[in-house]
Amino acid sequence: MKLSRLIFILILLHSLSFGVAMAQHVPANNNHDEERACAHQWLLEHGLNTKSLSLSLTYEDIGFLVFEDSRNHCFCVVANKEMWPLLYGPVLAYSTEVALYMNSKPSQQYNGVMKPFRDQLAALKMSAAGPDTATAIYTPKNKEVLPMLGSTKWNQYRPYNMFAPTKNGNRVLIGCVPTAVAMTMRYHQWPERGEDCCYYMMDSKTMATMDFSKCTPLWKSYKDIYFPEDTLDEGAQNLSKLMVSIGLSVDASFSDTGTSASMKNVKPTLCNHFGYSGHIAFHDMRRHNLTEEQMEAILYKELDEGRPCIVSNAGHAFVCDGYSDGFLHYNFGWSGHYNGYYRLMTGRYNKLISGEPPILVKYFISGIEPQQPDGGVSREITLKKAGTLQDMLTDTEKETITKLTLKGPLNGSDIKLLRKMAGANDGFSLDGWRGGALTELNLREAKIKDDKTAYYSKPAKGVWTSYENNKPRKYDFSKSLTKSDWISFKNGPGSRMQGMQIVRTDDDKYFEHYFCQRDMIGKFMFANCSSLKNLVLPITTEKVDDHAFQDCTSLTSIVLPPSTESIGRDPFRGCFSLEEVLLPRNLNVKDGTICEGCSPILRSAKRY
């Protein structure tokens, strides 16, 4: 082994030993024979050699044990025996690709990956649910889908970051999001060349441009793994440039100690610059009100259809690229370290220990695949009656139309469908819908009508304050309101709302519903329409309300019609591709609030 390669391995293992211990290293005299036998048998059944396998109990965590054999590059995580009756199975995770190389202090990576197991086992102890008699949301089509990324073992360090910017005299880390995106693109071997350009800030004062037409990935030249001395390798150099361009496009915050980026920015990067399908969708478990079972169902369906998913636990982005008999396979982008199979859920519990679901995957991106050359579909439709758009389109058209011109009256059901076609991910569905591909929407000759059909709904959050006899009264929807508080809210501020309504369900949950108002682009009307690149508003538009286009991450330009009289708060927050906003000359608005969270080139809105 070359000295530099040995040093690379030692540095990697040292970096993985960072962190705060959450349990205790195993004393030599501990005895867990049944758990060890379980791990041994499990690994034998999954391909390890009978004669050479020799497992060591290297770590005793809270509720489970880590067994590994570094010579055979494997590990197996087994729950303590007393927990087995509460679990889907005693094995929580395993790998036949790599050992964990545990020492007396578990690493930050270890704690990030294993903490969900601690939390789930604690939840099961506190309140285990009975047997699951419900019909499965989705049944996987296969017993297994082999890891689609194969033996890819990339990371964020040298040589992957050799063309990255420098800070404090050091090359910044590539970041987990660009690494996960690059690994997924390698699987698809797409594109041959990038397209268009993006703007980014080199520092607080200097803006630069990235020309993606000069980005030509050498897919056939990329290796499964590179080492620090591979800086002269043509494939390594090309890959580093690709990863840097991805990082700049997703607006990564580069640092020499850790680089971060928003998962929401992945779709516009792939669609706008690398020729990927608009069917890509970002899922946020809490924001989209998804259950653990629903998250798992979508992941399995994507894998069955041959699409790896980029997933995240809120601290690290990685790739889910396969499954086997109840376990999901992850490639963590840590030079192969920790790659293996993990249960998303270990058993059924009735309530949570903390405020968030105790699973490893809390966010993920589905539908990642190249746009087909003939995938664009254009339609022009004139509606004679509001609410009939659904009947004017076939199911295939709803999913595949990329350019749409609409004329005539529109109501809430029409807007709701347009949102779905334009990439808004408003809820869980396994009905075959692949996600919206609509990139260009022309509503110039359309007219928005008053309506009581909600075009958008979301869980109610935050605190509402009303004043009674000059005294404030607060209603906190992050908590359960008392019956008297709810009646007071309904008869007070709730009765005075325009264009929205807050409702209470039988299981004591609260939701905000938003409705169409005549000639108004209402609150959140096109929010999260992540496929939209160009949008022409109705010429009769009189008002644009708060957050109307929030998180339209692919939107590049927009013109507010001359009839527009007012505009609400933060209409374009999170539209990070937005480069141009044209406003009527007499529209009264503070330009500073218009451009927050948009492309760096958009310093202020232009007047006409």
Role assignments for model-derived ranges:
Residues 7-17:
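Bacterial N-terminal signal peptides
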Residues 19-23:
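Boundary at the C-terminal end of the N-terminal hydrophobic targeting segment
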Residues 24-58:
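Short, non-transmembrane alpha-helical segments in secretory-pathway proteins
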Residues 47-82:
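Exposed beta-strand-loop-beta-strand "reactive/processing" segments of non-cytosolic proteins
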Residues 74, 83-115, 271, 277, ...:
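Active-site signature of cysteine proteases
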Residues 87-259:
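Active-site-adjacent structural segments surrounding the nucleophilic cysteine of cysteine proteases
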Residues 378-384, 402-410, 436-452, 468-520, ...:
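Structural signature of tandem-repeat unit edges
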Residues 522-525, 545-548, 568-573, 593:
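Consensus positions within tandem repeat domains that build extended binding/scaffold surfaces
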